Amino acid sequence: MLGVAINVAVVDGSGTLMAFLRMNGAFLHSIDIAIDKAYTAASFGFPTSKWGGVIGDDELLRIGLNQRQRLVLFGGGLPLVDEGQRIGGIGVSGGSAEQDEACARAGLKVLGLN
């Protein structure tokens, strides 16, 4: 409904890829970004869009985190939490960070984890 072609990745609590969907026309480079958004959300237990607030004005932290492979610091990754237990993450890539996060939230709703 947003008019964007996306990639969607779901990882388990250990960050292992469990499911992946790619819409026709989705950018190839966003395959890995979707997987890494899911991995980041599963690893830290909060939305990837929250990293800006976590980092704040700490430029050294921002530089250091940007050098970490698989760590995504912009929106589109959400943790999967069931009955208070972190069980994985979902990552979406292909649109803007806001569009990606909206799609990830829709995925949570479908899974009954909103």
Explain the meaning of each model-derived region.
Residues 1-114:
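Flexible, solvent-exposed loop/hinge segments and secondary-structure transition points
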